[in-house]
């Protein structure tokens, strides 16, 4: 599908400029010089600003959903919310937790990944702990911190399939 977005204020070359642009199959294929293009749809942006999508690399949850306890539907709810706010991609940051709860979060992420979904792209898992120095633990519960453990790390990596 080919869509022309016209009358947009596009962030391009480090500034906003009036530009029309083409989308083909959901991706920008051309910026400027779009007059005369045959399109399936034409959208007048009315001078609104268009910027690249934002990427959130550290998210513990949103819209009442905590990634440590989320099921696949919870991940989908977060994805849709982020997309509505201009975030196009994100990493779920699993807090330091028990092995069982961390494995649950990894399983639910994998379950979500194996379904059809919409909204922002959940790029993978960011394990925030449990291998942290107590002096730099921040808000992580100290009783759940662990000394480095390669077997546990391998178990998490295997469960996540490298995600």
Residue ranges: model-predicted function:
Residues 1-51:
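Histidine-rich, glycine-flanked metal-binding segment
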Residues 13, 52, 62-64, 132-135:
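Conserved protein kinase catalytic core
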Residues 19, 27, 74, 78, ...:
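General structural feature for long, well-ordered alpha-helical segments within catalytic domains
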Residues 31, 65-67, 145:
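Short clusters of hydrophobic/aromatic residues that line enzyme substrate/ligand-binding pockets
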Residues 60, 76-105, 120-133, 160-163:
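Divalent metal-dependent hydrolysis catalytic cores, especially in the metallo-beta-lactamase
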Residues 105-163:
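Metal-coordinating catalytic core of metallo-dependent amide/deamination hydrolases
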């Amino acid at each position: 599908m080919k869509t022309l977005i016209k009358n947009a204020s596009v962030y391009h070359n480090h500034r906003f400029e009036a530009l029309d642009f083409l989308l083909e199959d959901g991706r920008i294929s051309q910026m400027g010089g779009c007059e005369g293009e045959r399109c399936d749809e034409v959208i007048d942006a009315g001078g609104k600003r268009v910027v690249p999508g934002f990427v959130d690399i550290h998210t513990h949850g949103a819209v009442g959903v905590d990634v440590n306890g989320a099921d696949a539907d919870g991940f989908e709810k977060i994805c849709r919310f982020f997309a509505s706010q201009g975030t196009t991609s994100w990493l779920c940051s699993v807090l330091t937790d028990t092995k069982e709860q961390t494995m649950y979060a990894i399983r639910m992420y994998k379950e979500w990944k194996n379904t059809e979904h919409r909204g922002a792209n959940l790029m993978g898992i960011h394990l925030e702990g449990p291998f942290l120095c107590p002096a730099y633990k921040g808000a992580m519960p100290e009783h759940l911190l662990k000394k480095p453990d390669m077997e546990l790390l391998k178990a998490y990596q295997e469960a996540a399939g490298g995600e």
